[in-house]
Amino acid sequence: MSGGGHGAEAAVAEVLERGRTDPAAAHVFTRTYAADALAAARAADVAAPGPERPLAGLPVTIKDLFDVAGETTLSGTSVRRGLPAAEADAVVVARLRRSGAAITGRTNMVEYAFGGVGLNPHLGTPRNPADPNVARVPGGSSSGAAVSVGLGLAVAAVGSDTAGSVRIPAALC
């Protein structure tokens, strides 16, 4: 986000556009939420600031390992396409929504969160933002989450960590 005194809606629109058009952002997202993110940012622009919405209007991404109501969680694999949709948001997703975050998308990951390099042959591997013109691994399994922050497509990202799944990509990106 470039700042410059514009509101949350303009900043989120800028981030969404960059995510859609920047070649370095290829394979970062498995799904984006432009309309919902812009609505959350618009609400932040008109609401009075308060402690109950500490993330009001800030662009945040979530790893495609956490359920979003009405959607199938892919967990980094195409095999899960067509499986039943989640009935409710994961707790972390529900809390982000309540905090006012503008959730811009679900991020790509290593298949079933099993791997530290960050490669995904099924859904594509996000490019390491440290040098997107060179084939450098982003680390995993929360590869898309780290890349979304590294490219400035989010101010924060939700990942998961069992054996370095957030720490490795955070260090590499």
Where are the regions that the model predicts?
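Gly/Ser-rich catalytic/binding loops embedded in alpha/beta enzyme cores
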Residues: 1-158, 162
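Cytochrome P450 heme-iron axial ligand motif
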Residues: 165
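Structural signature of FAD isoalloxazine-binding scaffolds in flavoprotein oxidoreductases
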Residues: 168-173
